[in-house]
Curated annotation (Swiss-Prot):
Pathway assigned to this chain's UniProt record: Isoprenoid biosynthesis; isopentenyl diphosphate biosynthesis via DXP pathway; isopentenyl diphosphate from 1-deoxy-D-xylulose 5-phosphate: step 2/6
Family statement drawn from the similarity comment of this UniProt entry: Belongs to the IspD/TarI cytidylyltransferase family. IspD subfamily.
GO molecular function: 2-C-methyl-D-erythritol 4-phosphate cytidylyltransferase activity
Residue numbers marked as site, Positions MEP for the nucleophilic attack: R152, K208
Site label Transition state stabilizer, positions: R13, K20
Gene (UniProt): ispD
Protein name, as recorded: 2-C-methyl-D-erythritol 4-phosphate cytidylyltransferase
Organism: Trichormus variabilis (strain ATCC 29413 / PCC 7937) (Anabaena variabilis)
Length: 228
């Protein structure tokens, strides 16, 4: 299975002016934990890191220390996540029929989750990892006035990996460019094109490291795994 890792962002909410994936959790850069999970996932055979060239020397140094046995390629990132994934799709080997896309900042995803998504995407056109929403969700207007309360039994918190048929995802990205759609994940492009996206049960610990508080939580989770 082919894995694309969007890793081109700057950690503004983290309060830093460089790629947040270079920040460390337990003496390892965030991206290193993501790559180690991909290395340990038996279904993953190829990894593409979508990032800016200014980060490539740092990423190459990290890779040298990890000594992964799977091929890793660097792909030029875009100005948005959507553009970055589009670039990643164009750079996939011709043999790629399905692809997993996994945020580099979700460094706590386990090899089991990557394997589950890789196996499931062989039997559907699109999928996302997701977990049921536990909190009550309110929909509010621009003035902060509550408009409705959706039934949380129908609500899922989207995660990554997200998996897709490569040709279908390319077509959806092309349609997104034509229509001027701006989306925050690839599943939304499938939805806009009327293509079903299946849910694979995600992991409660699969958080996206976005804030300094998330770094502390990630460290706690990694420590607890060592002690279990």
């Amino acid at each position: 299975m082919y894995l694309l890792i969007p890793a081109a962002g700057v950690g503004k909410r983290m309060g830093c002016d460089r790629n947040k994936l270079l920040l460390e959790v337990r003496s390892q850069p965030i991206i290193a934990w993501t790559l180690l999970a991909a290395q340990a996932a038996s279904e993953i055979s190829w990894i593409g890191i979508i990032s800016q060239p200014t980060d490539w020397p740092d990423f190459k140094s990290i890779l040298a220390n990890l000594q992964l046995t799977k091929p890793v390629e660097f792909i030029l990132g875009g100005s948005t996540r959507q553009e970055s994934v589009y670039n990643g799709l164009q750079a996939l080997p011709k043999a790629a029929e399905q692809v997993l896309i996994h945020d580099g900042a979700r460094c706590l995803a386990t090899p089991n989750l990557l394997n589950s998504c890789a196996q499931a995407i062989r039997h559907c056109s699109g999928l996302i990892a997701a977990v049921p929403v536990k909190d009550t969700i309110k929909v509010a207007d621009e003035d902060g006035i509550i408009q409705s309360t959706p039934d949380r039994r129908n609500l899922w918190a989207a995660q990554t990996p997200q998996g897709f048929n490569v040709e279908l995802l390319k077509q959806c990205h092309a349609e997104g460019v034509r229509q001027g759609w701006e989306v925050t994940d690839d599943a939304a492009l499938f939805e806009k094109c009327g293509i079903e996206v299946q849910i694979v049960e995600g992991e409660e610990t699969n958080l996206k490291v976005t804030t300094p508080q998330d770094l502390a939580i990630a460290e706690f989770i990694l420590n607890s795994r060592d002690n279990s």
